[in-house]
Amino acid sequence: PVIECDDEIVANEIFEVKVGLGKEVAHPNTTEHHIRWIRLYFHPEDAKYPYEIGNFEFNAHGESSAGPNEGSVYAHHQVTAQMKTAQPGTLHAMAFCNIHGLWENSKELGIK
């Protein structure tokens, strides 16, 4: 997953974090091959455990009683979360592809 946000944020001010897949090459979004979920965590420096920021499920991939990919609704595998923190640390994103399994990425977050 690609994590997009400023490298440094202002302590205790809300900021946006975008997480998605396929920024350079589009990831398939079909009944047979899709991203099922994205999870975002923040691990403050010197903290023992991370905090879960969000758990996002994508449940529509063109399914239909008429058959695979015959439905008209597709959830897109990108999310925007808002958060704030007083500490620097690391953002961790995980995404699950029903074919290729778990993908992970991280990004350091500093405080101005």
Residue ranges and their predicted role:
Residues 96-106:
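Short acidic/polar inter-strand loop motif in beta-rich domains
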Residues 20-31:
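Short amphipathic, basic-aromatic surface patches that mediate peripheral association
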Residues 14, 86-92:
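Extracellular Ig-like/FN3 beta-sandwich strand-entry sites
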Residues 69-80:
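Aromatic sugar-binding surface patches on proteins
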Residues 79-87:
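Short, hydrophobic beta-strand segments
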Residues 1-10:
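Short, compositionally biased P/S/T/A/G/V-rich stretches that sit at domain boundaries
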Residues 51-68:
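Solvent-exposed serine/threonine-rich low-complexity stretches and specific carbohydrate-binding patches
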Residues 32-54:
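Extended low-complexity, serine/threonine- and proline-enriched intrinsically disordered segments
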